[in-house]
Amino acid sequence: MSANSFDGSIVSSYLTTRMPPWAGVRQNVMGSSIDGRPVLPANSTTLTYETVSGTPLETAASAAASAAAATARGIVTDFAFLSPLASSAASRSSARDDKLTALLAQLDSLTRELNVVSQQLLDLRQQVSALKASSPPNAV
C-alpha cells in the first residue's frame, strides 16, 4: 500500500496527538505522517485511530473507537446530557424500590400464613398422636 492508494481513513500521529497543547506542538494545523497520510492536530475535536491493514474489521473497529471517544468527550463536556439520564435512573430506582417493598410485604404476609398453617399442622399431629395413644392396640 502506497501513500497514493491510501483509502481515506484519517490517522493520528503519536507525537502530535498525545502531547498536550502546552508542550509546543503546533495547534490547529493539519499535518501528515511520513508516508503522506493526513494527521489531525492535537487539539482536534475528533480523535481517530490508525488502521494497519485497512481490513473491514479494522476499519469498523477504528470507527467504533472514534465514535466512542467522541461520545465520551461529549458526555464529559455536556452536563445537560447527563441530567435526564440521572433523573431517569433515579425514577427507575424508585420504581424498583417500590416493587421491592411490595414484594417484601407480600412475603411477610405469606410467612405469617405459613406460620398459622404450620401451627395447625402441629396441633393435628398432636391430636393424631393422642388418639393413637388412647386407642387399644388392636382396635384399628
UniProtKB/Swiss-Prot annotation:
It comes from the Viruses. GO terms for molecular function: hexon binding. The keyword Coiled coil applies. InterPro entries: Hexon_assoc_IX. Disulfide bonds: none annotated. Transmembrane segments: none annotated. One of its GO terms (cellular component) is host cell nucleus. Gene3D superfamilies: 6.10.250.3040. Keywords: Capsid decoration protein, Capsid protein, Coiled coil, Host nucleus, Host-virus interaction, Phosphoprotein, Virion, Virus entry into host cell. The modification Phosphoserine is found at S135. HAMAP family: ADV_CAP9 (MF_04050). Structural component of the virion that forms triskelion structures consisting of three molecules that stabilize three hexon trimers at the center of each icosahedral facet and fixes the peripentonal hexons. Dispensable for assembly. During virus entry, recruits the anterograde motor kinesin-1 to the capsid docked at the nuclear pore complex thereby subjecting the docked capsid to a pulling force. The resulting tension leads to capsid disruption, dispersion of capsid fragments toward cell periphery and eventually viral DNA entry into the host nucleus. This protein is only encoded by mastadenoviruses, and may therefore play a role in mammals tropism. Belongs to the adenoviridae hexon-interlacing protein family. This is Hexon-interlacing protein.
